[in-house]
Amino acid sequence: MIPEASYDVVVVGAGPAGSTAAMYAAKNGASVLLLDKKREIGSPIQCAGFLPDASEVQALLREAMLPDTLKNYPDSCVLQRIDNQRIFTPNCNIKEFAVRGAVLDRCRYDQFLAEQAARAGAELMIKTRVTKIEGTTVETSGVFGKYRIKAKAIIGADGPNSLVAKSKGLALTSGSRETRLLSNTR
């Protein structure tokens, strides 16, 4: 028999979006389970790790409430601070523009965020793959065994090939720009 558990919120994917969502849910009193299939949070690295300065983001999205995770992170996560970006296009054009930000060590940053979620009260299970989602039940398999987990809310932060999105009819399709934008937010 597969053991059962119950949480207010199950977050699938412990990248920046998933760990931040788990942290805020836990801070607001929810029982939270944060799941990630990887052996080590942040590895393998999923992207280059550029993070614009919070003031740059706030200037673009004036009414947005930015999470603390975009504003406050340890210097140990910063590989380099920058104030200028240069982009080389495929046809060898160069675009340069001023933008303040930091290049982060994504492995350290992702681990920092997962630690913040755990400190806020979220439970973290790594090496755990989501095998099925049916309604509000998440089935997992991993080093902790197989579980059936009931959740009041399921947050899919599991990337562009999201099992959560597929289970909710939001799978990535080539014809839908809205779905593509939604699915690529991490």
From Swiss-Prot:
Belongs to the geranylgeranyl reductase family. ChlP subfamily. It comes from Methanosarcina barkeri. Gene3D superfamilies: FAD/NAD(P)-binding domain. GO terms for molecular function: FAD binding. This is Uncharacterized protein in nifH2 5'region. It comes from the Archaea. Pfam families: FAD_binding_3. InterPro entries: FAD-bd, FAD/NAD-bd_sf, Geranylgeranyl_reductase.
